[in-house]
A protein has these predicted regions:
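Terminal, non-globular segments
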Residues: 1-180
């Protein structure tokens, strides 16, 4: 004799049921351009801003909000290549393009799995993705291009902390651009 099966009290959530957001074309164009402008031009004047990676934060924001790996890759590639183009002659084209494409894919894939609206989750996501971003950037630069890059765990940890704190507030500001 078998016991009656207990009814499942949870819910099955399919990929289609997870809320994915859209953005106006103006937001899609202006938000990354402002982030890239700040990163490229204001960090030359305000050296302490150099620890922040605003384009990476924008890639993660759009990727987790859209929850589509293809759009995450495309967003990361475009923002990364624009960032590369403004990097100057000493910066090879494609390093940020590759890095931000990988981050865009990972963030959009993760956005389907977990709640990314929580500030604590956003903090952890940016902290981890900054470390991954730096690791991929170092791997591409050192491994493929044979650049003499220096790796410092303390610098990466402090940078990840600073980026995560700023990203929590930045994401709250960017939430205003979301459309269903």
């Amino acid at each position: 004799m078998t016991a009656p099966a207990m009814p499942f009290r949870g819910s099955y959530t399919s990929r289609e049921q997870v809320a994915a957001y859209e953005f106006s074309w103006l937001a899609i164009i202006l938000v990354p351009l402002v982030a890239i402008f700040i990163q490229a031009f204001l960090t030359a004047k305000l050296r302490w801003l150099a620890i922040l990676d605003l384009p990476m934060m924008v890639v993660v924001f759009f990727a987790v909000a859209r929850r589509n790996p293809i759009s995450g890759c495309i967003t990361g590639a475009i923002i990364g290549l624009l960032q590369d183009a403004l990097g100057g002659p000493a910066h090879p084209i494609g390093m940020y393009g590759i890095t931000d494409t990988i981050i865009g894919y990972m963030a959009s894939s993760l956005g389907v799995k977990i709640d990314v609206e929580n500030p604590g989750t956003r903090f952890l996501i940016i902290y981890v993705f900054f470390v991954v971003h730096q690791g991929v950037y170092y791997g591409v630069g050192h491994g493929l291009l044979r650049q003499s890059l220096q790796w410092s765990w303390s610098h990466v940890a402090i940078g990840a902390l600073a980026n995560a704190v700023v990203a929590v507030f930045l994401f709250q500001m960017l939430d205003r651009f979301k459309q269903r």
